[in-house]
């Protein structure tokens, strides 16, 4: 009681400007970015710096590897965003699990929890109810960049019955080199990397499990990623022989199904756009945004179509998606 009286007396002595700053500070959501020095962490921090309702809390660099200091910091924030390798992300989650009392909400940008029970997949546009699931979630797994594009293309078509769950899907894709981590970034920026390079040609990639889990595919897709000599930007492609689909739909049927699905999204980050007149698509046009655009290119004479998802691999494919999920989870 005495503490409350002293607090009220102190507040009465503050100017209007000081009162505003006091109440702003006490109402701000505190966020700790575990791994803020990496590419995704830095971008998240930059985006959060523009949000007056969020305060980013950082650990003393000297204590960065001190588990007790980290545990104490985590206990005092509203949310922890994990921008770590998978094993370290699991360690941080275990540390949060060990806390007593109110635990912070978690967004994990690693691959570690994307198909794990108890985690909500952080693509609010996935299906009806997914946005509300993110709003009410304690733990959200941020999607992978390629997976975001692939799921955005496939899930509405599978739900609509236009593409069978066992359809043989191919997903040739290209990303800017920032998606490859620090070593790839350094190689490209030092001129040590080729202008264009296909990779993961052993046909194993960490995004395939989440692509299957959240599209509903029962047949493993043929995913062929590549990297170009540009820092950021992404195209995920879905080529289709239309006559191989049940009922032999027209390309416009695919367009309409996608437009119907994403037209119901209240946030407007994912949209279906007309095919470009020149038959070209720039992978970098959505850089530094949280947007994802879908287009259906087609040649009905040959009954061919290629569906394209364009996004910033560091935006809707990483940090932009994390901030979108944070806003939904914290209501800021």
Each PLM stretch: what is its role?
Residues 28-194, 199-201, 297-300:
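N-terminal Rossmann-like NAD(P) cofactor-binding subdomain of oxidoreductases
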Residues 13-27:
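Short, Lys/Arg-enriched N-terminal segments with co-localized hydrophobic residues
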Residues 291-294, 298-332:
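NAD(P)-dependent Rossmann-like dehydrogenase/reductase catalytic/cofactor-binding core
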Residues 2-5:
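Extreme N-terminal basic, low-complexity initiation segments
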Residues 140, 254-255, 322:
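PAPS/PAP-binding and catalytic site of the sulfotransferase fold
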Residues 39-71, 83, 168-173, 177-307:
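C-terminal substrate-binding/catalytic lobe of Rossmann-fold NAD(P)-dependent oxidoreductases
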């Amino acid at each position: 009681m005495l503490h409350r009286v002293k607090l009220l007396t102190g507040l009465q002595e503050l100017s209007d400007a000081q009162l505003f700053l006091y109440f702003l500070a006490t109402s701000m959501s505190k966020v700790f970015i575990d791994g803020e020095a990496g590419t995704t962490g830095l971008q998240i921090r930059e985006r959060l710096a523009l949000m007056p309702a969020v305060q980013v809390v950082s650990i003393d660099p000297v204590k960065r590897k001190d588990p007790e200091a980290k545990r104490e910091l985590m206990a005092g924030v509203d949310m922890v965003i994990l921008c770590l390798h998978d094993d370290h992300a699991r360690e941080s989650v275990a540390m949060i699990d060990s806390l007593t009392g109110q635990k912070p909400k978690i967004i994990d940008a690693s691959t570690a929890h994307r198909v794990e029970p108890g985690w909500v997949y952080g693509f609010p546009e996935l299906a009806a109810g997914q946005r509300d699931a993110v709003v009410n979630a304690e733990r959200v797994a941020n999607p992978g960049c390629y997976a975001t594009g692939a799921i955005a293309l496939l899930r509405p078509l599978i739900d609509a019955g236009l593409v069978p769950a066992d359809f043989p899907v191919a997903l040739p894709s290209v990303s800017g080199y920032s998606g490859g981590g620090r070593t790839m970034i350094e190689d490209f920026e030092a001129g040590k990397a080729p202008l264009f390079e296909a990779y993961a040609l052993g046909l194993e990639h960490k995004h395939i499990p989440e692509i299957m889990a959240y599209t509903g595919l029962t047949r493993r897709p043929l995913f062929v990623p590549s990297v170009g000599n540009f820092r950021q930007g992404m195209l995920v492609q879905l080529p289709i022989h239309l006559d191989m689909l049940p009922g032999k739909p027209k390309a416009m049927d695919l367009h309409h199904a996608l437009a119907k699905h994403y037209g119901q999204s209240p946030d407007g980050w994912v949209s279906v756009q007309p095919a470009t007149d020149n038959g070209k698509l720039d992978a970098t046009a959505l850089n530094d945004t949280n947007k994802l655009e879908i287009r259906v290119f087609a040649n009905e004479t040959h009954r061919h179509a290629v569906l394209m998802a364009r996004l910033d691999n560091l935006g809707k494919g990483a940090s932009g998606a994390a901030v979108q999920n944070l806003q939904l989870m914290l209501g800021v």
